Design a protein with these regions (language model features):
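A conserved beta-strand element that flanks and buttresses the S-adenosyl-L-methionine
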Residues: 123
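Short catalytic micro-motifs in class I SAM-dependent methyltransferases
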Residues: 126-127
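Conserved beta-strand/loop positions that form the S-adenosyl-L-methionine
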Residues: 60
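Class I (Rossmann-like) S-adenosyl-L-methionine-dependent methyltransferase catalytic domain
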Residues: 1-53, 64-114, 131, 138, ...
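A short glycine-rich, Lys/Arg-flanked "PGG" loop and its adjoining helix->strand segment in the class I
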Residues: 137-149
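Short acidic/histidine-rich motifs immediately flanking catalytic phosphotransfer sites
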Residues: 118
Length: 225
């Protein structure tokens, strides 16, 4: 159990059970982001994944399921996976449906051991930066090797090291590499592609300027070769 996981799980338990965005720190100055911002995330995910009614979606590090739910409603269902039993309990209480459910498991371990279950699209939003390089690479390569129907993965809300100067002084390179820091590891598109391995083409996108994190984050879309 890492310090980052302990902080993630402990923080979630300090928030009211219905404070879905506060539990997963999808906030600005401590306040939950506006619904319009969430809608932007959902629409971008649908577009980047080319999500269709017949798709089955895997949400890795899904948190409490609040972001998964509107995506599952756009497809044929699937599964959300998170390491926090508390957040998965919130997801099961508020967001489970007849065609999708939530599982307590480490994201990389799930990719390496779970049945493919017809998964065609996958999402890891705002969480890849908290995985160490080895775990991230194992997860992405296992998804390619073990999930033959999986065509696209969205790695969303990645902190861009080219923008780190907005937050950190020069010489803070060590902290930028640390997945246990408050923002996690800052990785360039080239570094993300290296983690993904040769089985994926990687395309990077930025959100519109009025998105709350557009000034320092980007999305990476992995497309099976």
């Amino acid at each position: 159990m890492t310090a980052a996981w302990t902080d993630y799980d402990t923080h979630a338990r300090t928030r009211p059970r219905g404070d879905f965005w506060g539990q997963v720190r999808r906030t600005v100055r401590g306040q939950p982001v506006a619904q319009a911002q969430i809608d932007m995330i959902v629409e971008a995910a649908v577009a980047h994944l080319a999500l269709e009614p017949g798709d089955r979606l895997l949400d890795l590090a899904c948190g409490n399921g609040a972001l998964s739910r509107p995506l599952f409603q756009r497809c044929a269902g699937g599964v959300g996976v998170d390491i926090s039993d508390y957040l998965v309990s919130v997801a099961r209480e508020h967001f489970a449906g007849p065609a999708h459910g939530y599982v307590v498991m480490d994201a990389a371990a799930y990719a390496e051991t779970a049945a493919p279950d017809g998964i065609t699209k996958a999402l890891c939003y705002g969480s890849l930066s908290y995985l160490a390089d080895d775990a991230a690479a194992r997860m992405l390569r296992a998804l390619h090797g073990r999930f033959p129907a999986l065509r696209r993965i969205l790695l969303g809300n990645l902190p861009d090291p080219a923008r780190a100067g907005l937050f950190y002084p020069a010489g803070a390179a060590a902290e930028l590499r640390e997945p246990r820091s408050s923002i996690g590891a800052w990785r360039s598109p080239v570094e993300v592609a290296a983690l993904a391995g040769p089985g994926w083409d990687v395309w990077c996108h930025t959100m519109p300027p009025d998105f709350f994190a557009a000034h320092y984050r980007y999305d990476a879309v992995l497309v099976r070769r």
